[in-house]
Amino acid sequence: ASHCERHEHYTGILADDLGLIFLSMLDLQNGSKHVRNCFLLFGLKIHIGVRGGGKDGKDSESKTFAMLIPKLQDRKHLPQPESYDLDDETFVPFCTKFKYLGSTITCDLDDTTEIERRLSLAHMTFNKFRKLLCNQRIRVDLRGQLYQMCVLSVLLAGCETWAVKHSHLTLLTSFHNRCTRAMCGLNLWHCWMHKISTENILQERLKMLPLDIIFYQRQLRFLHRVACMDPSRLTFQALSSQAARLPGMKMAAGKKVNTLSTWKNTLEKSGLSSEKSGGKLEEWIPNIRGPNCTTIVEEKLGLPPGSFKFKPRPIHPHTGF
């Protein structure tokens, strides 16, 4: 006991959902065998399919799936395989989309499927609370709080890491405006006949913000939380590894949309990053942790003074931000 040392391993708390990345099919097959053998040492078992292990001699279902993510130029031509074998009896099937930790991941790495699913869930949630949200006898501020807590929370769950296109924001904004009109007892015909603008409904009647501003706020809070992490944290390293655009990098026809470009657009809209910097850490991290950050964001996004705040966090002693 005198030779023992204490090690804090907080990431070892999670032992349920596991996602692994392999760079080739051979690595996937060999790595799956190593993971299965390692789990057996701890008395754990991976739920994989068994040949002929189901009813009527059919293959049993597998709770473990694999997904092939081909290169961008090969995604239209390369077919998805059905499964791969671990041994003579067990196999792991492939899938084109998979729900992992509440988010839907597709083989083309496009967030359209996840955003459409969020819109469907938010629509169902709004219909459940419609009698309360559209009840004119209830105070407007209470209905607005209920809408933000129940409907918007479902709609924008996980939006901090979305790769958002302009068409995605249009769909989200359209749903938000349709719900707010219903809360005021209006439709498009009323707005057209009486010249009622969306700004009038959101700001004057319901005291709400446009959905794109709410989206930017959520992403900024996430980026601020990551910027205040210890640089040794995996989340900080993952963000910093893709935050800077390579010098001389040329974009393909049409602007490529990914998580980096979405974060960069949010930082530019908020005045925390210039358009030429590519979102480099040395620029936007000191800005988002600076004392005037909230003032800059409020001015750029048109928010009322004092309405946007970050949770205060101490300056890191080694990095200085």
Regions found by a protein language model. Give the residues of each.
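Short linear motifs embedded in intrinsically disordered, charge-biased segments
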Residues: 1-321
